[in-house]
Amino acid sequence: MATPHINAEMGDFADVVLMPGDPLRAKYIAETFLQDVKEVCNVRSMFGYTGTYKGRKISVMGHGMGIPSCSIYATELIKDFGVKKIIRVGSCGAVRDDVKLRDVVIGMGASTDSKVNRIRFGGHDFAAIADFGMVQNAVDAAKAKGIPVKVGNIFSADLFYNPDFEFFKTMDKYGIVGVEMEAAGIYGVAAEFGAKALTICTVSDHILRGEATTSEERQLTFNEMMEIALESVLLGDADEA
């Protein structure tokens, strides 16, 4: 049954959903990587698609920008459409010197300046972490394809234009491997409703060095990230068989 933000029916979504921020990127993923694709939702032009990858039913849907937006979609997918696993696939900024442009980052944990998980967790700090099995499957998929990855703690920021530039240096000191805007929210929603989640990002810019990738470079690395995400789903199926 349709929800206020997703005009689909039960069964339209697979149990695994890949979620980029940009709905047009969701369309690209569906058209490039999936077969037998069907559009299953389009409210507010937040497109969702279901198809198959190597015979495995998989869905992809945009989640918008920031924790409030992605939390709405993740909640409805899990509660109302029976989704069991969400993989966020997006971009992030780097602060550490050893994290380079176009690196693929796997968010094992997600620190944040948002208060949403404290609200969920009775006012206490909640350690927003990815599902270990999904992390392991993504690492194994990357190794099989010869794609190097950085695994660690990422930071989900409420502000894209943060006036406190010095805080990025603090992130560097604490070993943050990537800065984005959604993972902590998705991990919190997954924990609240008994689902599993993972975030995989490509580094589009280095915040402290002022470096940025071109659109062509972003696309190449994005495709590598998508291959990791999709292959990790198949590895997860094998683990659970």
UniProtKB/Swiss-Prot annotation:
Residues that coordinate or bind phosphate: G21, R25, R44, R88, V89, G90, S91
InterPro entries the record matches: DeoD-type (IPR004402), Nucleoside_phosphorylase_CS (IPR018016), Nucleoside_phosphorylase_d (IPR000845), Nucleoside_phosphorylase_sf (IPR035994)
CDD domains assigned to the protein according to its UniProt record, in alphabetical order: PNP_EcPNPI-like
Keyword field contains NADP: no
Classification via SUPFAM superfamilies: Purine and uridine phosphorylases (SSF53167)
EC number per UniProt: 2.4.2.1
Gene3D superfamilies in UniProt: Nucleoside phosphorylase domain (3.40.50.1580)
Reactions it catalyzes: a purine D-ribonucleoside + phosphate = a purine nucleobase + alpha-D-ribose 1-phosphate; a purine 2'-deoxy-D-ribonucleoside + phosphate = a purine nucleobase + 2-deoxy-alpha-D-ribose 1-phosphate
Record bears the keyword Transferase: yes
One Gene Ontology CC term in the entry: cytosol
Active site residues according to the UniProt entry: D205 (proton donor)
Sites marked Important for catalytic activity: R218
GO molecular function ontology, one term from the record: purine-nucleoside phosphorylase activity
Family the UniProt entry places it in: Belongs to the PNP/UDP phosphorylase family.
Quaternary structure and interacting proteins, as annotated: Homohexamer; trimer of homodimers.
Protein name: Purine nucleoside phosphorylase DeoD-type 1
Gene from which this protein is expressed: deoD1
